[in-house]
Regions:
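The feature captures the beta-strand-to-loop junction immediately N-terminal to the Walker
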Residues: 38-40
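Helix-to-loop junction immediately C-terminal to a conserved catalytic motif
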Residues: 53
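Conserved ABC transporter NBD signature motif
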Residues: 58-69, 81, 109-114
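ABC ATPase NBD coupling module
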Residues: 69-89, 124, 214-217
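Walker B catalytic motif
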Residues: 155-156
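Conserved beta-strand-loop-alpha-helix hinge in the C-terminal portion
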Residues: 204-219
Length: 219
């Protein structure tokens, strides 16, 4: 089992030109375990995920990983240390086959095919020809094979059927890693779990607590 790990944003601010996308937010995602960043488009949820990964710079505040300030550590170095980001778009290599995409993550793809057997007949196809849901399965399979300590995923179940989406969240919740996902709505499979949720609105955190608390507050 992986040792306990955690990633945090502390008083984090991010600007895109004149627009401030994050207004000094603080959040912590412990692991192993699943944390959800919840919010509508423009809420800052994706920006927060990217800030943790190092693909967008902070204008103020810090990113902390296992007690160490990694704010100035570039994204590629965070990846080398065991952080895996699965963005919403361009998460697979479209010109390569499904098999080649998987082999870039690990020589043996058995684990990925166990997780998503739907990919088995697609192995010879180029990833760019897959449907949106199939591409998400492939991208997440690569993340599973990477055996990362921290896994960050933007809208993991986008384009998937309800059954496959539920399976996806079972897989993510079962990883021996710190897993952070960004979603517009809380997935049904997480409603009664002790999953940690941060709800963002216009760049600020408006709720933090367990998923069940969020549902109770809205009942």
């Amino acid at each position: 089992m992986t040792a306990k790990t955690a990633v945090s944003l502390r008083h984090a601010r991010v600007r895109y030109g004149p627009l401030e996308a994050l207004h000094g937010i603080t959040l912590t995602a412990p692991g192993p375990g699943l944390t959800v960043l919840l919010g509508r488009n423009g809420s800052g949820r994706t920006t927060a995920l990217r800030a943790l990964a190092g693909t967008v710079p902070l204008t103020d505040g810090s990113v902390v990983w296992d007690g160490t300030d990694v704010t100035r550590v570039p994204a590629y170095e965070r990846a080398r240390r065991g952080l895996c980001l699965v963005p919403e778009r361009q998460a697979v290599f479209g010109s390569l086959t499904v098999r080649e995409n998987l082999e870039l993550a690990a020589p043996a793809a058995d684990l990925a095919l166990d997780a998503y057997p739907q990919l088995a007949p697609l192995l010879p196809r180029r990833a760019g020809t897959l449907s949106g849901g199939e591409q998400r399965m492939l991208a997440l399979s690569r993340a599973l094979l990477a055996r990362a300590r921290v896994v960050l995923v933007d809208e993991p179940a986008q384009g998937m059927s309800p059954t496959v989406a539920a399976r996806t969240y079972e897989l993510l919740a079962g990883l021996d890693a710190c897993v952070v996902v960004a979603e517009q709505r809380l997935p049904p499979t997480l409603h009664d779990r002790t999953t940690i949720v941060y709800e963002l609105r216009r760049g600020s955190v408006v709720f933090s607590g367990e998923a069940a608390e969020l549902r109770t507050g809205r009942a």
